[in-house]
């Protein structure tokens, strides 16, 4: 799973995904991409599940790029613990995905295979997505 090697701070603010993405909104590597329609927090496990689903569909042909990286530590308190007494320990990493952000890109496979792979990957993600092509 994806995680930063080193962090400046152990814990982060909850934050919000407010505005549209300013960078990473166009295809940079592949011919087909998966673009987010709404903003949400995507965890490292969800990214990995999407990657596995897409590469299985592609039968390990072609190339897949992941354009997002989970760099925000998300902390949680244990179950059935009373309020207060601190924030809780970091449990996993996530990325705040803004609307319009390209998350996955595919190159080197036929169009129908690429579209099917991106559909399978989008089913693993909590954000609504659309598939974009290079020539759109």
From Swiss-Prot:
Organism field: Rickettsia massiliae (strain Mtu5)
Family listed: Belongs to the universal ribosomal protein uL16 family.
A GO molecular-function annotation: rRNA binding
Domain of life from the UniProt record: Bacteria
Function: Binds 23S rRNA and is also seen to make contacts with the A and possibly P site tRNAs.
Subunit record text: Part of the 50S ribosomal subunit.
Gene Ontology terms: cellular component: cytosolic large ribosomal subunit
Name of the protein in its database record: Large ribosomal subunit protein uL16
One of the GO BP terms on file: translation
PROSITE patterns in UniProt: RIBOSOMAL_L16_1, RIBOSOMAL_L16_2
Keyword Nucleotide-binding recorded: no
SUPFAM superfamilies: Ribosomal protein L16p/L10e
This protein's UniProt keywords: Ribonucleoprotein, Ribosomal protein, RNA-binding, rRNA-binding, tRNA-binding
């Amino acid at each position: 799973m994806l995680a930063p090697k080193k962090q400046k701070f152990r814990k982060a603010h909850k934050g919000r995904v407010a505005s549209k993405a300013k960078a990473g909104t166009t295809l940079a590597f592949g011919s087909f991409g998966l673009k987010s329609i709404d903003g949400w927090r995507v965890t490292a496990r969800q990214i990995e599940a999407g990657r596995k689903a897409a590469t299985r569909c592609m039968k390990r042909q072609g190339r897949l790029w992941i354009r997002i990286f989970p760099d925000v530590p998300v902390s949680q308190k244990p179950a059935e613990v009373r309020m207060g007494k601190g924030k809780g320990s970091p449990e996993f990493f996530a990325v705040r995905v803004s609307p319009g952000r390209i998350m996955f890109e595919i190159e080197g496979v036929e169009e129908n295979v690429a579209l099917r792979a991106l559909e399978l990957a989008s089913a693993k993600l909590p954000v609504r997505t659309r598939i974009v092509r290079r020539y759109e």
